[in-house]
C-alpha cells in the first residue's frame, strides 16, 4: 500500500506556537506506516527545530503561488494542511485538485 503524503504548509520560518503544534502532529503520526508527513515553509530558524525533531522539511524560497506549485509538483502530496491565513490562501490557489485543509 502506498503511503498517503501530507504536506503541512506554513508561512513562518520561525519556531513558535503554530509551528510547535505542527511538529507535535507530525511526531504523533510518525508511527503510522500509511502516512508520510512533511513540513513546508520558508527556510530559517525553523530548520534547526525540525532537524532536532527528525521532521522532513521542504524549504521554499517564499510563500507564493508559483513556489508552492513548484513544491507540489516535486513532492506530489495527497493532501495539503495549511496552518495560517496566508498559507491557506496561497495553498488554495496553488493546490489544483489536491484537497486542502485550512484553519
Where do the protein language model's features map onto the residues?
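Proline-aspartate-enriched helix->loop->beta-strand connector
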Residues: 76-78
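Short His-centered aromatic/hydrophobic patch
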Residues: 82-88
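Active-site proximal beta-strand in glycosyltransferases
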Residues: 6-7, 95-103
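Short hydrophobic/charged patches on amphipathic alpha-helices used for structural packing
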Residues: 65-69
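Nucleotide donor/acceptor-binding cores
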Residues: 2-4
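Short, well-ordered alpha-helical microsegments
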Residues: 46-47, 88-91
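N-terminal strand-loop element at the rim of the active site
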Residues: 8-63
